[in-house]
């Protein structure tokens, strides 16, 4: 019975992380049909590199680890010459991290739902281009 209780406890923690959702979305909202180069990585995974067309997006859902220490770092570069760039922590702990690349910077909206939506509420500038 003791092992069953431990199993149920660990299983519940895993399911809680799954239900709450974890993910990154990067949306290209740059002007003048500019493309957006992106590459993200964690301790265990690499996303990209890929080029996101103007108006396009890159979305990745994943499981964060049991201890809540999952981190993703991302680098974004504005096309066509990719001379403006920024590297930043794109995910920490939990939730859905919705990033929007715009001419004046990179904006973030954190969502605590199961999936991304098209809303723009609570969007704030988090990074400036270098």
From Swiss-Prot:
Its main location: secreted. Coiled coil: none annotated. GO terms for cellular component: extracellular region. Belongs to the plant self-incompatibility (S1) protein family. This is S-protein homolog 32. Pfam families: Self-incomp_S1. Keywords: Secreted, Self-incompatibility, Signal. GO terms for biological process: rejection of self pollen. It is found in: Secreted. Residues 1-21 form the signal peptide.
